[in-house]
């Protein structure tokens, strides 16, 4: 399964013990699902865990069943639908929405007075319209709805809860998203996916360690290249002196250093300085 599927599977382990939280979660699902109108509700998902949760969620929150559910053997996109006027009226009544009014969807904050209800709403929104990228590849979590006011008001709710989502429009959809690993960790923890949040944290630690190792390797490689280049230049000079019969005419310490370099072409200046008798400093041998 993908990381996003694993997150949704973890979220679906919530027990649905509190009615108000079930209503809030159902509210999030409806505002972020495929179709939510006064005549039809349609929810399409590829998450089998979410598909297994939906009938229990709607029974707990609204006391209703779906008119259409996927068959047990169905694969791919799983579809749920409600077209019954009575059932839709029951949902609207529970959510304190006017069935006969012109329906411009927005978030009724009166339904989300407690923190647990806010988190349940966000959990439902993510289950219906959210996704998160494998943190080993990159950091990106988003929630998508076709309803502009819903997205703007959900953004306000997230900000009130201490998050800083970014917004964009794409293909007629309104998207809230996070690209910072710490925001993704905190969001997943808040809506009930603590194990997945730890997965994001572990991926970040691994990336930081790997980047640190790469930086050190690059630095050491660059230093080694400098040592090799310097050594090759010194070896060429020593050979030229030797061929000209000038090597033995060098002053004692310089001659000793040249002979050590000829015998130890891969040694650093610091290592050569330590080989001299008596040893001298790196700066002295460089001079």
What does each of the following model-derived ranges do?
Residues 1-94:
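N-terminal low-complexity or simple alpha-helical regulatory segments
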Residues 15-23, 111-118, 248-252:
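Structural motif
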Residues 34-36, 134, 167, 234-239:
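Short acidic (Asp/Glu) and glycine-rich catalytic loops that position anionic groups and cofactors
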Residues 36-42, 136-138, 268-270:
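Short acidic, hydrophobic short linear motifs in intrinsically disordered regions
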Residues 52, 56-201:
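DNA-contacting interfaces and partner/effector-binding or oligomerization modules
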Residues 190-287:
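Extended mid-to-C-terminal alpha-helical interaction segments
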